[in-house]
């Protein structure tokens, strides 16, 4: 799959989680920060990145750079996703279900941020297993990567979309 050029898109970013870690040294503790950041254009492109640095702003900046390198294209049908799917990352599992227009984004913090940045307006989600923000974010991205529209499936099978829907 070709890498998506972030410079061509109008991306906005959102910090999902900031974590402080401590390294104990002879003179006390050394603190370091990690930031989990999501970037997206609300038109079907989204990416998640992790940045680590001694200061929070630097960690966020690195997270944004990393997220721009990991952009994916999300197939959106009307305002929702094409079909139900489960994404897994580590012990984190997330169930994504298409929803009727007007439902809104029913999701927890990390999953909600990613779906809103991707441009999904109506969706039902359920966190299964671990709810660690890192695993939830990566499980959501894995699920979104695996989505296929009827047209994509038809093309892969060499059939028309009508034949696929008919069964």
UniProtKB/Swiss-Prot annotation:
Keywords: Ribonucleoprotein, Ribosomal protein, RNA-binding, rRNA-binding. The keyword ATP-binding does not apply. One of its GO terms (cellular component) is small ribosomal subunit. SUPFAM superfamilies: dsRNA-binding domain-like, Ribosomal protein S5 domain 2-like. One of its GO terms (biological process) is translation. The N-terminal domain interacts with the head of the 30S subunit; the C-terminal domain interacts with the body and contacts protein S4. The interaction surface between S4 and S5 is involved in control of translational fidelity. With S4 and S12 plays an important role in translational accuracy. Located at the back of the 30S subunit body where it stabilizes the conformation of the head with respect to the body. This is Small ribosomal subunit protein uS5. It comes from Carboxydothermus hydrogenoformans (strain ATCC BAA-161 / DSM 6008 / Z-2901). The gene is rpsE.
């Amino acid at each position: 799959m070709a890498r998506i050029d972030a410079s061509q898109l109008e991306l906005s970013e959102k910090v999902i989680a900031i974590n402080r870690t401590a390294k104990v040294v002879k003179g006390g503790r050394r603190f370091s920060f990690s930031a989990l950041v999501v970037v997206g254009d609300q038109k079907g492109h989204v990416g998640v990145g992790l940045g680590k640095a001694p200061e929070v702003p630097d960690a966020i900046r690195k997270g944004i750079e990393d997220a721009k390198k990991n952009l994916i294209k999300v197939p959106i049908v009307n305002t929702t996703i094409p079909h139900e799917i489960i994404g897994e990352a580590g012990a984190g599992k997330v169930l994504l279900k298409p929803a009727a227009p007007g439902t809104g984004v029913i999701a927890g913090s990390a999953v909600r941020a990613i779906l809103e940045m991707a441009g999904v307006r109506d969706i039902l989600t359920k966190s299964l297993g671990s709810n660690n923000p890192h695993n939830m974010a990566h499980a959501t991205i894995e699920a979104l990567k695996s989505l296929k529209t009827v047209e994509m499936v038809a093309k892969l099978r060499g059939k028309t979309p009508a034949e696929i829907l008919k069964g």
